[in-house]
From Swiss-Prot:
GO molecular-function term, one example from the UniProt record: metal ion binding
BP GO terms, sorted: heme biosynthetic process
Name of the protein described by the UniProt record: Ferrochelatase
Pathway given in the UniProt record: Porphyrin-containing compound metabolism; protoheme biosynthesis; protoheme from protoporphyrin-IX: step 1/1
Keywords noted in UniProt: Cytoplasm, Heme biosynthesis, Iron, Lyase, Metal-binding, Porphyrin biosynthesis
SUPFAM superfamilies: Chelatase
Amino acid sequence: MKNTSDYGVLMMNLGTPDAPQTPEVRRYLREFLSDSRVVDLNPLIWKPILNLIILTIRPPKVAKIYQQVWMDEGSPLLVLSERLKEKVKEALSEKKGQTVPVELAMTYGNPSVEVAANKLREQGVKNIIVIPMYPQFSATTTAAAYDRLMKSLKNCPHWPSLQLLHDYADHPMYIKALSNSVRAQWDKQGERRHLVLSYHGIPKRYVTNGDPYARRCETTSRLVAEELELGDHEWTHVYQSRFGREEWLKPYADATLKALPSMGVKKINIISPAFSIDCIETLEEVTLELGDEFKNNGGLAFDYIPALNDTPDQVALYVNLIEQNSKQWT
């Protein structure tokens, strides 16, 4: 197969510690929480809190959580992202009849953006399609990925041409893929259940200041509900992962799941559309913490619907996104 593709692809996800141990988790959290896109507080206030309190208390606790979900091959986020990358590369190369360079990078941690970008350069890539693996745009995720990419190219003598994907919150193939996952779960369990769509939260202040994330999440939920022909009483939209005392996007997932049984909703399925790949937030927070919250307050059945991961639907979606963004080079 020829290696003369007109472009290469850089897939970017958030990041993960190198190991489920306290030192590695502390190193990762320091990099992640030092990004002003993630925490935009005055550094004179935030840095002492981060270094003296959070990075002292949180790493041992978070390391134990990672140990519960760690796979034999490594971090679930990295392992599953790599699997998706390889399948996307194979599918793209087969369609084009030539090898298409595809690399994976993490905004924080490894593989770094610098390493991934260098690999593309070494393969002679002059045009790069950048695919942040976040279905709903947010400055805290997608823009942070762009920042890291631009920083990595700062000292590059010859910049490649870049095509940056904004998001795909309303892409028909994405909505269809999520809906297919829900239908498959319903078939497996032999019944339709109330569907909870849970998204990673961000401070409400960010949205007030212009971040479109909440609107994009709401769009995804509405389209999935329409695709599944759900009535308003058959689905619920929530936000998880609240941190600190500041008000975040509502409704809060934990409070909502605690209340649902008293409203007559005893059986639910929950899906997290904002996560293209399963990770600590889905495998531990959703599956275990939110599941316990629901069942401890009268819920009878709780089943998490996995992220799209490296499924054929997600591979086809990413191939389509790449093809749509490569037209000027093909």
